[in-house]
From Swiss-Prot:
GO terms for molecular function: arginine-tRNA ligase activity; ATP binding. It comes from the Bacteria. PANTHER family: ARGININE--TRNA LIGASE, CYTOPLASMIC (PTHR11956:SF5), ARGINYL-TRNA SYNTHETASE (PTHR11956). It is found in: Cytoplasm. CDD domains: Anticodon_Ia_Arg, ArgRS_core. This is Arginine--tRNA ligase. One of its GO terms (biological process) is arginyl-tRNA aminoacylation. It comes from Salmonella enteritidis PT4 (strain P125109). Monomer.
Amino acid sequence: MNIQALLSEKVSQAMIAAGAPADCEPQVRQSAKVQFGDYQANGMMAVAKKLGMAPRQLAEQVLTHLDLSGIASKVEIAGPGFINIFLEPAFLAEQVQQALTSDRLGVSQPTRQTIVVDYSAPNVAKEMHVGHLRSTIIGDAAVRTLEFLGHHVIRANHVGDWGTQFGMLIAWLEKQQQENAGDMALADLEGFYRDAKKHYDEDEAFAERARNYVVKLQSGDTYFREMWRKLVDITMTQNQITYDRLNVTLTRDDVMGESLYNPMLPGIVADLKAKGLAVESEGATVVFLDEFKNKEGDPMGVIIQKKDGGYLYTTTDIACAKYRYETLHADRVLYYIDSRQHQHLMQAWTIVRKAGYVPDSVPLEHHMFGMMLGKDGKPFKTRAGGTVKLADLLDEALERARRLVAEKNPDMSADELEKLANAVGIGAVKYADLSKNRTTDYIFDWDNMLAFEGNTAPYMQYAYTRVLSVFRKADIDEQALASAPVIISEDREAQLAARLLQFEETLTVVAREGTPHVMCAYLYDVAGLFSGFYEHCPILSAENDAVRNSRLKLAQLTAKTLKLGLDTLGIETVERM
């Protein structure tokens, strides 16, 4: 149930009846303060201006046409023309009852779309580091949300699996007589990569051999393709362990690396030339874009093929967007890539649109994100100043969580303790990131993320177990509870019910904007409202069975909402803490 959408429709009809144009925006929003009701319609200002009348006068006319019987208990005009809507307790009770009868908690399904989500994108022959964390977990939260809403989601892990580095790696492996790459751990590959790069920079004969190997690899030579495949396999096997630890839904089947688009690049360049979009400039093939200016104020040149015939990331990204529309039949494409790549993507997509590869009706969206910083406000590094490996970060999270939960649960079995530490430790790392607006940088702080107070994973996981504890203490007749009516008579019951019923609205925002922090804020709010409700509205010691059962049902919907909401974020819940 999307109450905001229902009210928007009703207010819009009333505005049109009051003389507003058919495309008027009612601007119905969740109210920021209790005294302004549950929702507020703010659209009178803009429409009144167009009609040449006072906003309050328009609001008064709208009210004469607004029928919210059975939905609102009170509707009032505030200030210059805001319309405050207070929901009817009986309406809230009915919607809570309906939500409890559905596994989806009453969340409706939008028109199904095919949505491609590009996220994670590690590089072959390198271990994942903290720089991969944000794309991986924010992208996965978007995927989970879109799938829950009923969309057909295609995960696209745009792995860096092509380029000159493979000539270096294969040449170095061969030099070391270690062609049997399948037996190597990825940590070895990291060392091999460093050594290969050193030799490439210092030994011209080695560099020449590496360049020849790239040519052979690109021409499809069987031996070199096999060596390349081994490197990819080792990397993705290791990455899968990290994905599984992070409770991320990516699998090997989702890999759509740069190599996938390689065969398409000559055709792309030829087509852009034929369409008059690409021209020769100083030996390279370039697309000049009026939409982007260089320092001199001239159209910026975007190279799509170098003098030596090599292609660039832009060329690959053009082919990639074309493939996602033509072959994957995407209705929408989301890219979870850091903010530093924004101009690069905008240039590639401008070319894509000009060439007619993807129509304007199919959105290409850069859901960019900021950086993870250390407490000093600089990019997060090891003490020695090196890049933090993701596996090491997760190991430390687990170790810290182990100490934390062991302290609080001295009698818990070793198995239970390990499960709980894993849920808390990994959950803390993910939630600390997901709860921040993705567009900003954020400070990575162990103490904050593992705290049991505030908007953290441990607090949210504890809040969930606290609701469950009510049911453990109660001697509940499941059948009697299922058939019991919901009664909303106290303010705190109404506030909790109204917020619980905004779950669909929250999911809709996350799906549209790709902002999981909105879900985190919502769940934190629900947990806080339940805490106030629990304190002021006795459940197990309620004045009679009818009130007790009704409050148990509110607790039941709270538990289900917290669990489902955390699941869309990829955060595990636990039964005990």
